[in-house]
Amino acid sequence: MLTHWNNLLNTDCIVVDVGPHTIYPIFKNGSSSLMSVADKTYVNKQITECNNIDIIIRDPETRFVAGLNEYCQQNNLDIEDTWELVYEGKLINRHFAPQWLWLLHLYKFYKGTVVLKSFKSLTKYCSVRKNKSVKKIDVALINNFVEIDYKLMDHINETTDLETLIRKYKNVLS
């Protein structure tokens, strides 16, 4: 299942410091806002310097719908036609890629402690909301885009080892 995600997994991985917090920005989870207020940026191997990374996790349904809408808006595409391509496995994009995929991406460079935070906690790190979508067209969920993300919601505010989290759900990915 992970093979078709390789193009996304092979992009630069970025972690930022915002004040005293180190955060892994995920697309459609406040990443533009976090990047705009970042004091320091770590890329790929520099991420090993980090300790205790916060990761904002958004409600999977809300994020999938917002991400697909954002992608269609940016590319001037019809949402229903685009949804079909995603459903058929012919289209992937970081805006609606599962959040667990983003954790795998981080895991390439970081094996330490993480704290999953709710999307509501974004205001703790920044007051700016960049790229907030206004108009959203509802679409049906695609199970393999949200299944593990719903399980991640059970770990909000838990401090855990990223490796432990990855191992816990790796069988679901197979």
Where are these regions (language model features)?
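Extended, non-globular or repeat-rich regions with surface exposure
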Residues: M1-W5
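PAPS-dependent sulfotransferase catalytic domain
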Residues: N6-I14, N44-I57, E61-T164, K168, ...
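Extended, structured, electrostatic nucleic-acid-contact surfaces
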Residues: C13-P25
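Catalytic nucleophile-elbow at a beta strand-turn-alpha helix junction centered on a G-D-S/GDSL motif
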Residues: P25-V37, R58-T62
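Short, solvent-exposed loop/edge-beta patches enriched in aromatic
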Residues: F27-S31, Y42, E49
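Hydrophobic residues on the short alpha-helix immediately C-terminal to a glycine-rich phosphate/catalytic loop
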Residues: V37-A38, I156
